[in-house]
Amino acid sequence: MRKIISMAAAALILASGSALAGDAAQGQSLYNAKGCVGCHGMNGKSNNEQLYPSINGKGAGFVSAAIAAFKSGERSNPMMGPMAQTVTAAEAADIDAYLAGQ
């Protein structure tokens, strides 16, 4: 019985981890389609750091956490607050996967 419970727990952990892992190719498409590129620049490299920070290469989870913080109101910004509301958790994970590799 313990073996079955252990195997079930391991399967749940693996399944939840893969659900959080984003698709970089889909993330690139979303990054462009949702307009992120307009402020944060090609591949997440901003042309105006004072207004729009670069968000490339920050590591896995950075962008997803930032989007979640803007959605919840933990972080506020008149531009990012409304933009974050249009991004699902799955889309954020995809965008995150794309930008983490840039």
Language-model regions, residue ranges each:
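Acidic/polar helix N-cap motif
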Residues: 23, 59, 88-91
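The canonical Cys-X-X-Cys-His
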Residues: 35-42, 95
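Electrostatic cytochrome c docking/interface patches
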Residues: 15-32, 46-51, 69
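Classic N-terminal secretory signal peptides
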Residues: 1-20
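Axial heme c-ligation environment in periplasmic c-type cytochrome domains
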Residues: 48-54, 68-102
